[in-house]
Amino acid sequence: MSQLRPRDSSAGKSSSPRRTDRNPESIDVNSKGGSEGMTSGLVPGTAPHKEDETEAEDDIDCGRLITSKSLATMLTTASMYAGVSQLDDDAIESSALDEPIPYVPYEEDAESVMSESTVGVDTVRDTDSSEQINPEIDGLVALRKKQQHTLSKFELSVVRKRCSQLSLAGSSSGSTRRNSFTLDNNETTRAVKLCEKLKTTFDLSDDDEFVNDYPCWLLHEVFLQGHIYITSRYLLYFAFLPKRDSTVTMSGALSIRSSTTMRFSVRRWAVLKGNYFRLYANSTERYFPSLNIDLRFLLKVELSNPNLEENKPTVFKLITEARTHYFQADSLDNARSWVTDLRKHIFTAKNSGGHVTIKVPLENILDLSIETLFEASQTLKLKVLESEESYAIDDYYFMFFNNGDQVLDSIRQSMKALGIELTDSDSSESDSDVSGSETNGRSTHRKSKLSRSLSVLTPIPRGIGSIYKPIKSSASGIIGAIKKPQKSATRPFSSVVETVVPNDNDSELKQDHAGDAPKDSEEPSTKPSNWSAKSLVQGFLSTTSSISQSMLFASPMHYNNQLFIERGEEDPYFVTNKEEREVAQSRFRKHFSLPDSEELLASYFCHFQKNIPVYGKVYLGTTCICYRSLFPGTNTTMILPYSDIENVYNLKGFRFGYSGLVIVIRAHEELFFEFGSNESRDDCDLFLLKQLDFTKSHKNAHSEQKRKRNDSIKLAESVQLADARLRYFETRIESDIGREVPIILEENQYSTSEIRSKRRYKFVLLTIGSRGDVQPYISLAKGLLAENHKVKIVTHEEFKPWVESYGIEFATIAGNPAELMSLMVTHKSLSVGFLKEAKEKFTGWIGELLQSSWDACQDADVLIESPSAMAGIHIAEKLQIPYFRAFTMPWTRTRAYPHAFVVPEQKRGGSYNYLTHIIFENVFWKGISGEVNKWREQVLMLPKTNLERLEQNKVPFLYNVSPTVFPPSMDFPHWVKVVGYWFLDEGEADSYDPPKPLLEFMEKAKTDGKKLVYIGFGSIVVSDPKQLTEAVIDAVLSADVRCILNKGWSDRLGKQTGVEVELPEEIYNSGNVPHDWLFGKIDASVHHGGSGTTGATLRAGIPTIIKPFFGDQFFYANRVEDIGVGIGLRKLNSKSLSKAIKEVTTNTRIIEKAKEIGKQIQSENGVSAAIRCLYQEMEYAKKLSKSKQKYWDNQSEDISDDSVSGSWFEV
């Protein structure tokens, strides 16, 4: 894959890539698809060289320089050019959806690109190369004759331009690989297809002529990567938009402002996906949004106060036609992230065609100017007459990092050929419109009279709030902020709304949908009225009751009769009036914020059975069934995809005379609906089953293709990671200029732009504990290595060979994991006895751990630590580097879960859960504070600290657990993420060779028809291994199953006296077997409940039995019971284990639920999600570390409240 490289200032020489390891703003942008990255049919844009700023990002005084260079560097290298090939690919997309286009592209390497750009040779004119291209024109003519098509003037101009560029590229690079004057058949065909696509997209005539094309960025409320095409009559702009309808771009908890108290007292889970923004009651809810906003009709999104402190809660607002919604994020950075992503989605939603096209007749251009807004960029400003009738003038801004002057010259020459006279001036009067600071540039003004109006095929919508305000104001706001980063630009809001939504006539009983606001207060009537509360309520109830009864027993309404046509029957419920059907379709999409492709098939009035029957209406669409309540005071909305429905069946209603319908949902409780008649219920059942059959057949047809496509996606190429990298650079720019800068890169099926940081961060992963604590970090390290970063794992010496076998750097810290585990198993949870023994055995070890951790982590750029390691937060404070925590058990204050070391026997509510975290934090800090503060003063040269100043609850936290098992709590702040398991697959077919006796044992169990169960408690230390082994043997024989046994408990610090227990033939002693290889081949698993083992079991989709010994194992024993996939054993003996094994191997409900949970976990990529969060929260983490140093700099005395030496015993 070719890589864009900076060019040297000396002409005629191509430069080698410069080392930019210490510059986080430097990026690579690669093009995927086509050939080696440069799939363009025309001149590729190359990045102008920028001197490296090695340490500038850490210098506060260089903020403005950093802002300019970071934005310039990023957008420059992102201006790769794939537009022509994309247009070509898109032209034949309909005929080749499943396979890439068989295309052998122009073999142009990076050196040829660099040479052409360095010498700065302008494009050769058609007349200069006519002799060279005649053979190619003859070949094209022959091709067209064969296709029975006459060669047009426009096609000739495209081929001539292509030959000229090949000639220039070959001469400047000195390449001898091909004749630079020759086009092969593939390129000739490609040029013809390009002509057809341009003519179709922009409605060009055959008499038009192609002049040139250039990569550029459209400056609007977003920075949109695209391409300008210049013809003899038009200036054309084209950009593909990313298609992310099925991907959740952003999610997290937000506070909502109450309309009555005006306080942000309610937390909801927000999801931004495709064209909608929805709020749910919690992170596990998927079908019942409490708020549903269609982004196509959103007018504006902005921060309410962008000048707040960094880590203070920040309010942003969404303005719709009906009301303004206020949301509070946990910090300014988080609010900016929401605003930036919302603006991108709004822009994409309002340009639903998948691309943005602008067509400007050259005759309508009133003014041209090139302005240098900041270093290494040129901005082309166009003043264009919109129409002769309105005489409105539009401003368009296009940013170039190369060839800006050439673009201006090309436009001038084309206009001159049309007889439009131009004059030059040193600077345009409108230069100051873009920025308050001085700009250098040249301007061209019209003298001739206009003769035709501007034509825009797919224009940027105008007049829709600040998102789609006139481009002049949006561009000036962004660029003005770049020029003056210390000042916050104010953005005007236009109240003009172009979108008109029809009224809904079937919602007399309530307001529209969750996204709408209450009606404005009416003015009080001047007429006297005689009424009482009793009469008013009686009248209201009687009216609504009569309406409800009449609507409930109304007949179904069909809006598509294809089902009855296929059956050869007449549809008695079909709405024959076309206008009524169109209005109903519009209402349906509006209510549930559905795309235009969603079609309403039928609708029914019914009751939805929740706590009480809720009257409403069911809608059957092409891909989902929807419901909305119609009774006053209720606000229930449901959007349920057919793909999540397992079955539908009929039953009697709960009330006399009603007919019931049950919808069975995968991994969710059943839904009950009551209809007023059997006819309506049966009709709904018929339509539902038909759509389910269609959905399943369609899904099966594409499942194999989807699987192959997913298998080919690498970690570094995932959409989520690409978005995270882009968001990281956006965050840096926003932090510098104090304004949101949404950047949209082009993307289509065959070619996408990818941003990568050129700086290789040194990630240090610090952890202590057992093998299960180290294994996830190896998986994360592999992902970071794939991202081209450097990684070092710091842990106990015994894991060194294992870690280094993956090519990961290793460093040692103090401590014996077996002794730590023995302490934990002995005391199980936090207690006085635990503290006493810890004081006796580990007081000296804490000092050794802190010192060895500091020695191993001093070269870190980013530090990720298990909080049990204790040293990381202090090391990050000293080094002023981003610091993250990662763990497998609850460690963050929340009301949803107790602390993993203080899990009660039974659930005791949110207040108790929150209290367990407070208690543990204080006890844990009291136990280590003495050693820690001594180490801080003597080694780190930092002042003493206390629990408050540590600000542990503000540290970005990554939970490497599946959100299916550990759903994010609503009171988690935005920097606490549940990313998914970090699996380390060691048992793949090419890396693990199972012993033959194990395979024979498994095959015999299958032949005998016996369930196969795995039993192993990892590296747990137990006091009496023999007794535990005997209990396992008795339980296996009693349950009549076959067992694969891993007796790890007898190998570590156990009593080695006595004779080893002999195992019966029903049990095979396997030792360590890779879980990813084994668990997919058995029926159930019994283990200790470690996070890694639990995750591997659940991913395999098999039931699990957990016997917890200490720590988070009690937590996961409760979780597997809560989600219905297994059993937690508080006490293990032969009887209890036998009963549990029988239950999980025979209970169909547990088995099916485990399979469903397994599918969900298999669809997750925890490592990819973790790296995405690292990018997203990197800037926040760095600010947090630096803020502590600023605090100490402002303190004149030690604030530590630890007057006595803290220890493990003094609490």
Curated annotation (Swiss-Prot):
Q: Keyword Cytoplasm on this protein?
A: yes
Write down the superkingdom of origin: Eukaryota
Task: Name a single GO cellular component.
Answer: phagophore assembly site membrane
Query: What is its EC class?
Result: transferase
Residues annotated for UDP-alpha-D-glucose binding in this entry: 770-771, 773, 1046, 1072-1073, 1075, 1088, 1091-1093, 1112-1113
| Keyword ATP-binding appears in the UniProt entry | no
- Reactions catalysed according to its record: a sterol + UDP-alpha-D-glucose = a sterol 3-beta-D-glucoside + UDP + H(+); ergosterol + UDP-alpha-D-glucose = ergosteryl 3-beta-D-glucoside + UDP + H(+)
In what residue span(s) does the GRAM domain sit?
Answer: 196-235, 586-652
The record's section on Gene3D superfamilies has: Glycogen Phosphorylase B, Pleckstrin-homology domain (PH domain)/Phosphotyrosine-binding domain (PTB)
The EC number(s) attached to this protein equal 2.4.1.-, 2.4.1.173
Topology within the bilayer = Peripheral membrane protein
Alphabetical UniProt keywords: Autophagy, Cytoplasm, Glycosyltransferase, Lipid biosynthesis, Lipid metabolism, Membrane, Protein transport, Repeat, Steroid biosynthesis, Steroid metabolism, Sterol biosynthesis, Sterol metabolism, Transferase, Transport
Q: Which residue ranges does the record assign to the PH domain?
A: 248-347
Quote the biased-composition stretches of kind Acidic residues, using this chain's numbering.
423-432
First and last residue of the signal peptide: none
User: Pfam family example for this protein?
Assistant: EryCIII-like_C
Q: Where is this region: Disordered?
A: 1-61, 422-452, 500-531
Family matches, as PROSITE patterns: PH_DOMAIN
Please give the InterPro entries that the UniProt record associates with this protein.
ATG26_PH_GRAM1 (IPR048066), ATG26_PH_GRAM2 (IPR048065), EryCIII-like_C (IPR010610), Glycosyltransferase_28 (IPR050426), GlycoTrans_28_N (IPR004276), GRAM (IPR004182), PH-like_dom_sf (IPR011993), PH_domain (IPR001849)
* Bias type Basic and acidic residues, positions: 1-10, 507-525
What's written under domain? Answer: The first GRAM domain is required for association with the micropexophagic apparatus.
Identify the PANTHER family for this entry.
STEROL 3-BETA-GLUCOSYLTRANSFERASE
- Belongs to which family? Belongs to the glycosyltransferase 28 family.
Function according to Swiss-Prot or TrEMBL: Sterol glycosyltransferase responsible for the glycosylation of ergosterol to form ergosterol-glucoside. Shows also activity in vitro on other sterols such as cholesterol, beta-sitosterol, stigmasterol and tomatidine. Probable sterol 3-beta-glucosyltransferase that mediates autophagic degradation of peroxisomes (pexophagy).
Q: What is this protein called?
A: Sterol 3-beta-glucosyltransferase
